[in-house]
A protein has these predicted regions:
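Core segments of transmembrane alpha-helices
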Residues: 21, 79-83
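Conserved beta-hairpin
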Residues: 82-113, 120
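Hydrophobic residues embedded in beta-strands of well-ordered beta-sheets
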Residues: 106-107, 130-132
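Individual transmembrane alpha-helix segments
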Residues: 62-80
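Cytosolic juxtamembrane regulatory segments of multi-pass membrane proteins
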Residues: 54-55, 109-128
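Structured, soluble extracytoplasmic/luminal domains of envelope-associated proteins
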Residues: 161-163
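Canonical phosphoinositide-binding patch of PH/PH-like domains
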Residues: 133-157
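N-terminal membrane-targeting/pre-transmembrane regions
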Residues: 1-66
Length: 163
């Protein structure tokens, strides 16, 4: 039985993106919750703007600058950690998809199907995206060759069954 396996290149790229988003989120979060609140407003202005605050800038304006920059770091932390979460969930979803096939049929979501159970094979996205959609009575599956190794072999098997 041939089992679809997670594409290594897909996995590496998504793990890299996950790491980048997580590190950036941690960095922004550290700035928002630790570094910026502990830094005096004038020193924070100087570290961000690379120049001392103007002489006519009041303490209230410096405090407003600090509050705005802290809020910005907080928002950036939420956005990047949210992106990391979305990448992780997508990766888990793709990794959790199980599909295997042999000469007699295939197993989809733990249920065995015969090749004759396939009622429709949609290859409209194959040339552009290497996506194959198969369906039958009460079930369907979208198989992406970018996500899983073995989809091309499955496509050839479906063609040989002339469905």
């Amino acid at each position: 039985m041939t089992t679809l396996k997670l594409n290594r290149e897909f996995l590496v790229r998504h793990l890299f993106a996950l790491a980048v988003f997580a590190v950036l989120g941690g960095w922004f979060g550290f700035d928002a919750f630790v570094r910026y609140p502990r830094t005096p407003a004038a020193a924070l202005y100087e570290s961000i703007e690379k120049a001392p605050p103007p002489a006519d800038m009041s303490q209230a304006k410096l405090d407003a600058f600090k509050a705005q920059k802290t809020k910005t770091q907080f928002v950036l932390a939420i956005v990047t950690l949210g992106a990391a979460l979305l990448v992780a969930l997508h990766l888990l979803s793709v990794a959790g998809f199980k599909f295997a096939f042999d000469d007699d049929g295939f197993v989809l979501r733990g249920k065995r199907f015969a090749w004759g159970d396939v009622k429709n094979v949609d290859e409209s996205l194959w040339e552009k995206k290497s996506v194959l959609r198969i369906s039958g009575d009460g079930w369907d599956a979208t198989l992406d060759a970018w996500h899983h190794v073995g989809v091309k072999e499955l496509r050839e098997r479906l063609k040989s069954k002339s469905l």
